Amino acid sequence: MHISPQNVKSFIAKFRRQKILVVGDLMLDRYIYGHVNRLSPEAPVPIVRVRDEKNMPGGAANVARNVKALGSGASIFGLIGSDQAGRDLLNVLRADGLSSTYVTTVNKTKTTVKMRVIGDRQQVVRVDWDNKPAINDGLLKKMCLKAVKATAQCTGVILADYAKGLICPEIVSSILKAARRNKVPVAVDPKVNWNLPMDGIAIATPNRKEAFSLAGIPETEPARNPLNDRALLRASDILMEKWNPSLLIITLGAQGMLVARHARPPFHVTTFAREVFDVSGAGDTVIGTMLLALSAGANDIEAAELANCAAGVVVGKIGTATCSGKELLEFTRDLRR
């Protein structure tokens, strides 16, 4: 690792000065935990005897939860339905100390829910209730005005798109204009169908599959060394020219991440994960940690290493997990032993 232990501690301390606004699709992550000891006589599937249930913030709300866990202030901008799942989501947001001032409840709309059944520390099945909120012209105008106000009151913005309808040209343009006016850095986690404004963004964090799709070229088998992966480097070059971000981070799962920047060669950060139980939300951890680290004064390499370490903590847990500042500090210390 290039980052020194002293700098890790200093950056984490500076996280507390930040106030991050997370804009995106909100959903409820519901976990059913149990024990498996036999197969069903009805079908070749395991029977899970339920021991516990837990609701967690999902989607963009999990990004905010990650930011909060690292010590920063966090506000959420998004929509929920006027249903029990929406109320459950508000309850877990409050329990986690996340500001829901900019969360709007839409009547006659259902909240997206993703339920995961975990049997003996292994995910057995995931069940999704996907819903897109109905955003009429009146609501859209109010949301744009609210987005401008929220952006002016934060130190950084994360646009977390989960393809559920909130991230649209009008809201994104309003946020980017307000961010430029207030000199607020914006980080974007784009999905494969992203075709929205990207003017002036600081960070973009697609995964490998998304990067190839957004670059418009076919995905190839990964090379052993990402810096020798010609197709990946071509996708990176295309996206740097297309979006013009300060930093492009392509997350590569077990291979870590590739980081591209202007006028300098890209660099590769290997994964620091020691155990992998669940990759749910690892990308949320990366974008939140990157923005916080850069805002705290870390350079490109230091920020990428911190983000990879935080992701290493998260994938070693079951469920939509987070990494605290203390865990991040301990993880980086353990890597040096």
Specify the residue positions occupied by each region the protein language model found:
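Extended, hydrophobic alpha-helical segments in both membrane/secreted and soluble proteins
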Residues: 158-159, 175, 186-188, 194-197, ...
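Conserved N-terminal subdomain of the carbohydrate kinase-like
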Residues: 2-5, 11, 17-20, 28-158, ...
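Structural motif
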Residues: 21-23, 126, 155-158, 187, ...
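Conserved structural-core and active-site-/substrate-pathway-adjacent residues in large, well-folded domains
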Residues: 25, 67, 115, 157-160, ...
